[in-house]
Amino acid sequence: MAAGSELRPMIPVVTPDEMAAIDAAAPEPATTLIARAGAAVARAAIDEMDGCLGRRVVVLAGPGANGADGRVAARRLALRGARTTVVDVSGVGDRLPDADLVIDAAYGTGLRRPWTAPATESPILAVDLPSGVDPLTGCAMGRPLPAERTVTFAALKPGLLLGEGRRLAGRVEVVDIGLDVSSATAWLVTDDDISQMVPSRPVDAHKWQSACWVVAGSSGMEGAAGLAATAAQRAGAGYVRLSVPGGRAHDRPPEAVGWPLDRNITVDPGEVARFASMVVGPGLGPSGEVAAGVRRIVADTSVPMVVDGDGLKALGNGMPC
């Protein structure tokens, strides 16, 4: 990240139904929102082509708001000197004209049936969502056009993140066009979000200021223990202790310290108190005595704890919801 740049917050993710409600609640007319969306598409097109004057742009435009966004972009690009051609999706043939860029404004999130896109070898910029991708599941419905880049509005859609949609969307840019997405119930966590969660270590820090005890693994599942220990190290733990109940931590990273622990996961509370966090569960296996040990350590331990894998199974089988 460049020095002085601002950290981006988590990105909202909304379903098609949620997006429809957000659009309906917009305080401004649809024409204003379409103008903003089209301007954003035009800017992205210029960026993709590294210029505009004399560039050939084909806009595949549908009948709805997606097509309207594309037509606005076409007019703006023409004003900047691009040679633009708008092809109405209702009359398109098997192949699009050659171009420096094709703007897919055919259907976006509005398609609910299989669609075979016309052939093209030109790079593609998709508007909101590659046409032919299910906006909820990311499944390809028919034969969509694979985009180099997708400009989507207000929030991400699940179809941009899931299934084939993730590949077909290419690089995704979320553009603010003035819609209120505060009602979103799902958010994409970015690298910037994670960087804010992981604290910086002071120069005079020592290992016990952020020690983590990992209780994980079993016979045949030693790799889970090693992965959990490595994750703790990468999250910033200065000292990682790894215990495989009733076994040895064969696959532990060399920086992690092995510590014997019986199958009952009997731990000294005073020893636990030395740690800033614990990880319990990955790869522990279905043993009843191990499950009982997990429930006991969760009940008796006050340090922050991540419970995963077989640890969650142990809690689900032994504790009321």
Go through each PLM region and give its residues.
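Glycine-rich oxoanion-binding loops at beta->alpha junctions
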Residues: 88-97, 110
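Short secondary-structure boundary/hinge segments and terminal tails
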Residues: 92-96, 135, 250, 315-316
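Small-residue (G/A/S/T)-rich helix-start motifs and N-terminal tracts that mark the onset
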Residues: 1-85, 101, 149, 160-321
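Active-site loop/turn elements of alpha/beta-hydrolase fold enzymes
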Residues: 89, 129, 244-245
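Internal gly/pro-rich beta-alpha loop/helix module
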Residues: 99-101, 106-186
